[in-house]
Regions:
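Extended low-complexity, serine/threonine- and proline-enriched intrinsically disordered segments
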Residues: 84-119, 206-240, 327-352, 438-463
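Solvent-exposed, conformationally flexible loop/turn segments
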Residues: 81-86, 124, 198-202, 246, ...
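Short, aromatic- and glycine-rich surface loops/edge beta-strands on solvent-exposed regions
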Residues: 135-149, 256-271, 338-339, 369-383, ...
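Aromatic sugar-binding surface patches on proteins
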Residues: 114, 118-129, 233-251, 350, ...
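His-Asp-centered catalytic microenvironments across diverse enzyme cores
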Residues: 3-112, 176-197, 301-318, 416-429
């Protein structure tokens, strides 16, 4: 043919010059797709094909050959699928990122909404084009190509006509949306390869990445539909949690109510000042909301910057008995404090108590009643007077932790002077009138306790005590049922002043059986 690779015959029946060097030295197996020699010998095939077979062949574009893509299956242009809602096609490709699929209706209009095609690796230099069909009917399945070393526009590669006998269920099916820089940033899908249908509202997305320039990923969940904003309906909740894995990252998702959700995942970069980059996205159909309490802890940027690690829990907390605890691993001597809220109301600071041992700080929490609460955790570096916000969790309590919930209030001097609680790590609920409290302390510290009524009026004088082996046990007789306060005072003999210093207090509830 004299015009081979030089141009094409247009609709105006005129020859249009358009040189294409890829048409020269082409493998006859691919040349036969678009040109049928009248003489079989010029097919240069081991097994020549008939005119009828030629007319069934799909016609790859010149760009397909230029970028080195080859058909390994489905070499005809029309396929009928009776018993399935999907189709898989195999191709040879030197790179995964140079291919993209697309699904159109019979008129050639690209389908909107969910992504119905996916290109996935399937062995060395082999890829699979997978397509799902939203409904029975006729569709055009397309494969697009581009250069490997640039992000130029996608160009037509191949087009198939598919007669689908089945379609996926409503609000089902489809594949993840892949960002423009997905492969350039070194990401690969691990699982799932399709959009998610969740029976319990939970989803787990795993993606591979070994790029040292990526510092992490984050997920953002949105409920599909107008005027449906999770931030408004679930203020204070975080519905995505990311964990580092050996291969990359796992994003855990909680859907709070049944419905259709859109999950978008973004990459964080080590390069300072660079904004987060879109990685991929999924549709999640939740058939139920996560119960009894959805969501995950919210961590501030400072939490990571200080080198802290949230050990447990890594989900919001459900506590049938009203008692919760949070463990944080810290490389430094950070002083943690917890503050409980219900709605917009700040609750008594005495409902939280913090202990530290072997580099792990534990924040204990008492719910004062049934309901949902928000725990805000703050941290203060040694030598600093300012506490900084670090984290928040939601706690759902089925009951109050106690009839007298909360913990003793301890001033900084209590710990700085070396005092420790031996018993009664919580506020005291006593069914008897006699109460004892034991404190350990250095030999240069002496302690005394005083009893006050619910109106903060002192009852009597200092309470009797016994000291042995650097421990002091104080005895107290409660005069009647009701609420009281035990105030702790101490004297530090190593200081010039020997005056008593207020160190802390217990709330006491005397309730006879």
């Amino acid at each position: 043919e004299p015009t081979w690779g030089a141009g094409y015959l247009g609709n105006d029946l005129l020859f249009h010059r358009s040189p294409n060097v890829a048409m020269f030295l082409m493998d006859p197996e691919y040349a036969i797709c678009s040109h049928y020699p009248a003489d079989e010998q010029w097919q240069f095939l081991d097994q020549p094909i008939s005119k009828e077979e030629f007319e069934k062949l799909v016609v790859p574009s010149g760009r397909i050959h230029e970028v080195g893509v080859e058909l390994l299956s489905h070499k005809e242009s029309i396929y009928t699928i009776k018993d399935a809602d999907n189709i898989d096609m195999m191709f040879y490709s030197p790179s995964l990122k140079i291919l993209r699929g697309g699904l159109k209706d019979s008129s050639g209009k690209e389908l909107e909404g969910r992504k119905w095609t996916q290109v996935i690796p399937c062995g060395v230099n082999k890829v699979k084009l997978r397509a799902q069909f939203p409904t029975p009917g006729k569709f055009k399945l397309c494969l697009y190509v581009r250069d490997a070393d640039s992000n130029n526009t996608w160009q037509h590669g191949i087009e198939y006509l598919i007669n689908a006998g089945k379609g996926v269920e409503k609000r089902r099916g489809g594949f993840p949306r892949i960002g423009n820089e997905f492969y350039e940033m070194g990401f690969y899908l691990d699982h799932p390869f399709e959009n998610v249908v969740s029976q319990d509202g939970k989803a787990y997305i795993s993606i591979e990445n070994y790029n040292s320039q990526i510092s992490g990923v984050s997920g953002h969940l949105e409920l599909e539909g107008k005027d449906k904003k999770l931030e408004k309906e679930f203020n204070g909740f975080t519905f995505c949690w990311t964990e580092k894995t050996n291969k990359g990252y796992q994003v855990k998702v909680h859907c709070p109510v049944p419905g259709e959700y859109s999950l978008n995942i973004f990459a964080k970069h080590t390069e300072e000042g660079r904004s987060n980059t879109y990685v991929c996205g999924y549709y999640i159909t939740a058939l139920a909301g996560v119960r009894p309490v959805p969501g995950f802890p919210r961590l501030s940027d400072r939490f990571d910057a200080w080198g802290l690690e949230l050990m447990e829990p890594r989900e919001n907390i459900h506590v049938p008995d009203g008692r919760a605890s949070v463990k944080i691993k810290t490389p430094n001597e950070i002083i943690f404090s917890g503050h409980l809220m219900k709605g917009s109301q700040y609750l008594d600071n005495g409902l939280c108590f913090t202990t530290t041992s072997d580099g792990v700080s534990t924040v204990f929490v008492h719910a004062p009643e049934t309901g949902e609460f928000q725990l805000n955790i703050f941290g203060r570096k040694p030598g600093s007077k300012d506490s900084e916000y670090l984290s928040s969790l939601v706690i759902k309590a089925d009951q109050a932790a106690s009839l007298n919930p909360g913990f003793p209030y301890l001033k900084d001097e209590f710990k700085e002077w070396g005092l420790e609680l031996v018993d009664h790590f919580e506020n005291i609920l006593s069914h008897e009138s006699h109460v004892t409290v034991t404190l350990s302390h250095p030999s240069n510290i002496s302690v005394q306790l005083f009893l006050f009524d619910e109106h903060n009026k002192q009852i009597g004088y200092s309470l009797p005590s016994q000291t042995a082996d650097n421990k002091t046990t104080i005895s107290c007789e409660l005069p009647k049922p009701g609420s009281f306060k035990l105030n702790i005072f101490g004297t530090n003999l190593s200081l010039e002043s020997t005056k008593q210093t207020y160190l802390g207090s217990y709330k006491v509830l005397y309730q006879p059986k």
